[in-house]
Regions:
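Conserved active-site tyrosine of GNAT-family acetyltransferases
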Residues: 123, 128
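A short beta-loop-alpha structural element at the N-terminal edge
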Residues: 4-18
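Conserved GNAT acetyl-CoA-binding A-motif
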Residues: 103-115
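Conserved acetyl-CoA-binding loop-helix of GNAT-fold acetyltransferases
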Residues: 82, 88-101
Length: 171
C-alpha cells in the first residue's frame, strides 16, 4: 500500500468532516452524542487555512487527517481521524509520525493531545503518556472524561531548528 501525506487544502474540509463523523460512529457512540459533537467534528476551510493540517491518501483517496496547532515549544494534535476501514492498517502511524516530525522541525519540544478513550491505546503505542484527564463536556454524562496525553519530542531536532530560526531572524 502506497501512502501519500500532504497538506490539506481548504476544499478538503467536507471530506475530512465526513471522515471525523465516520470515525466517531465506528465506536458505537449514541447518535445523540454524535449530534452533540457535530460542531467539534466539523473541519472548516478556515480551520485548514489557519492551522497545519495533513491528509493521508491511498490510491489518491483521502483516508485520514491530522491537525497540528503550534505555539512556541508546544504542538497540540487536533482532529486526528481515520476512515474506519483503514484503522489498524499503519496509515494512522504514518500520519502521526509525519505530524510529529513536522512539529519537531517547527521547534516544538512537547506534543500534547486530548484523546478519545478508544484511541488512547494508539497514542500510547506512538509514545505518548497519559498526564491527566479533562472533562468531555457531555450534557447528560458529566462523568465522561478524555485522557490528556503528552510526549517529549526530539529536543535535538527542535534545538537545531530553533538555532537556525534564531540565526535567520538576526540577519
Amino acid at each position: 500500500m502506497n501512502i501519500e501525506i500532504r497538506r490539506a487544502h481548504p476544499n478538503d474540509a467536507e471530506v475530512l468532516t465526513a471522515i471525523a463523523h465516520a470515525a466517531k460512529r465506528h465506536w458505537d457512540y449514541p447518535e445523540a452524542w454524535i449530534e452533540q459533537w457535530k460542531i467539534d467534528l466539523t473541519i472548516t476551510p478556515e480551520f485548514i487555512s489557519e492551522h497545519e493540517v495533513f491528509v493521508a491518501l491511498v490510491d489518491q483517496k483521502i483516508v485520514g487527517c491530522c491537525a497540528l496547532v503550534l505555539s512556541d515549544s508546544l504542538a497540540e494534535i487536533e482532529h486526528m481521524w481515520m476512515r474506519p476501514e483503514q484503522m489498524g492498517s499503519g496509515i494512522g502511524r504514518a500520519l502521526f509520525e509525519h505530524a510529529k516530525r513536522h512539529a519537531e522541525e517547527r521547534g516544538a519540544r512537547v506534543l500534547e493531545l486530548s484523546a478519545d478513550p478508544n484511541a488512547e491505546g494508539f497514542y500510547a503505542r506512538m509514545g505518548a503518556e497519559r498526564i491527566g484527564k479533562i472533562p468531555a463536556g457531555m450534557s447528560g454524562d458529566e462523568s465522561r472524561v478524555l485522557p490528556r496525553m503528552s510526549m517529549n519530542l526530539n529536543s535535538q531536532t527542535a534545538s537545531v531548528f530553533s538555532k537556525v530560526k534564531d540565526q535567520s531572524s538576526q540577519t
